[in-house]
């Protein structure tokens, strides 16, 4: 089995910029992400797969100084003045592109697109000094679980020592559920799917992952699956059960974080 050189972390990133605005419904999530950042070895770079970028083919940001993409609507003016002036890492981006192509995955460089809120919101919480370079990799538009497991596996041959691979999505993403906290049908679906998902991740059961829509509460927890797909990229890259699972309340719903720690290098 290939040695896992990177720390791999899937997070539920919350609602738009709300985690950065002191929203009460995100306090537990902010504390959780800060705890995770303090627990992990400080990375020299972060590779992010965010739910908020889909393209065909897969694209990789190559800018040395990426801008921010305020890809949310209807929030207070300060939401659009958030700054996170991290650098990019063009050399790492080139290595990712080379590795993906070598593994038969069609991928292109993206020199212009900024980092979306699935990147800068959790990064600002975890690494507020913006002194760790970020590279963002898109999801493919078809959102195929099989493909995104393979996308993660395609990176297994890279030396990602001291790199954090971050899957930024949400283990529950039904907007109606967030706006209807008393909807017991959706609340029950949330709890059922979280239990099923933890079991699937604990077994690294890729066949089950590909059938997530048939899981208890699956379809109601994710009317569209883009927020779940980054988890499958992480699971594909790790190829084994998680090391740590953290569940927190976000806006009245259970939301999960999954962590796979890098392997110790042999002496």
PLM segments and residue spans:
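N-terminal short beta-loop-beta anion/metal-coordinating cradle
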Residues: 1-5, 67, 113-121
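A short aromatic-anchored loop/beta-hairpin motif
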Residues: 2-100, 107
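Beta-strand elements within well-structured catalytic alpha/beta cores of enzymes
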Residues: 7-12, 45-50, 137, 158-171, ...
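Short, solvent-exposed loop/turn segments at secondary-structure junctions
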Residues: 15-17, 53-55, 142, 171-173, ...
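Conserved phosphate-coordination/catalytic loops
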Residues: 24-28, 87, 145-149, 222-225
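Long, well-ordered alpha-helical scaffolding segments within enzyme catalytic domains
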Residues: 28-39, 146-161
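Internal, conserved structured core segments that host functional sites
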Residues: 93-147
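Surface-exposed, charge/polar-rich loops and edge strands
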Residues: 95-98, 102, 132-133, 143, ...
């Amino acid at each position: 089995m290939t040695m896992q050189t990177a720390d791999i972390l899937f997070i539920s990133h919350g609602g738009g910029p709300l985690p950065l605005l002191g929203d009460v419904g995100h306090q537990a999530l902010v504390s959780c992400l800060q705890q995770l950042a303090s627990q992990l070895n400080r990375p020299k770079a972060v590779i992010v797969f965010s739910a908020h970028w889909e393209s065909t083919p897969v694209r990789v940001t190559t800018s040395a100084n990426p801008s921010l993409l305020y890809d949310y609507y209807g929030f207070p003016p300060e939401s659009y003045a958030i700054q996170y002036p991290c650098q990019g890492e063009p050399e790492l981006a080139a290595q990712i592109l080379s590795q993906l192509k070598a593994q038969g995955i069609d991928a292109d460089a993206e020199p212009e697109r900024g980092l979306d809120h699935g990147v800068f919101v959790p990064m600002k919480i975890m690494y507020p000094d913006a002194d760790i370079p970020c590279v963002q990799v898109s999801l493919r538009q078809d959102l195929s679980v099989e493909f995104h497991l393979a996308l993660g596996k395609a990176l297994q041959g890279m030396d990602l020592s001291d790199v954090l691979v971050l899957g930024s999505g949400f283990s529950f993403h039904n907007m109606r559920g967030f706006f209807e906290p008393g909807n017991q049908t959706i609340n029950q679906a949330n709890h059922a799917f979280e239990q099923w998902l933890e079991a699937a991740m604990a077994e690294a059961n890729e066949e089950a992952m590909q059938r997530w829509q048939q899981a208890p509460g699956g379809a109601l927890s994710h009317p569209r699956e883009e927020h779940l797909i980054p988890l499958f990229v992480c699971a594909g890259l790790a190829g084994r059960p998680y090391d740590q699972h953290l569940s927190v309340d976000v806006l009245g719903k259970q939301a999960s974080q999954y962590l796979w720690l890098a392997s110790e290098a042999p002496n």
